[in-house]
Amino acid sequence: MRVTAKSDYALRALIEIARRTDGAPVSAEELGRLQDIPHGFLQAILADLRRAGVVIAQRGQSGGWRLNKDADDVSVADVIRAVDGPLVSVYGMRPESVEYNAAAAVLQHVWIAGRSSLRDVFENVSVRQLADGKLPKAVTTRTADDDAWQSGDARQA
């Protein structure tokens, strides 16, 4: 899986918004400055998040962006889907929708298993956990394994 800049920036912006203990809106300019996100790109990302119901915009001099849901109720998977679509796609389609001939049908099981593994992590990590820097044990256990930090190429060496 490739994590796009769009998903990474969206999560970084949401971490900044969720860290505001007073719930005050944060301007796009401030979000961009704090996380070094290009302004135009950030505006498009925030629009995607607004359409998905994750954030709301507040107009006016003290306006900006706020979460539209509790940060505990917004998962990493929700954010990725809001800005990039399905967690796993094959030729732009969900894996279960791809038709294979008999010899290659086994690939569908691989793609669906991969999506299931991604869901195990992405659906169980909330924006609140990211903002607080407190990841669930399922994530910290996986990252405690030294092999988790190695790319496939490095492990084969």
Regions found by a protein language model. Give the residues of each.
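Short amphipathic alpha-helical interface segments
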Residues: 10-22
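The C-terminal cap of the DNA-recognition helix in HTH/winged-HTH DNA-binding domains
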Residues: 19-22, 33, 51
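A short alpha-helical element within helix-turn-helix/winged-helix DNA-binding domains
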Residues: 26-36
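Short coil turns linking two alpha-helices in DNA-binding domains
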Residues: 38-41
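Basic amphipathic alpha-helical segments that dock to polyanions
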Residues: 45-52
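Beta-hairpin "wing" of winged helix-turn-helix
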Residues: 53-68
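Conserved segment of winged-helix/HTH DNA-binding domains
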Residues: 71-96, 108, 112-115
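C-terminal regulatory/oligomerization modules of transcriptional regulators
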Residues: 95-157
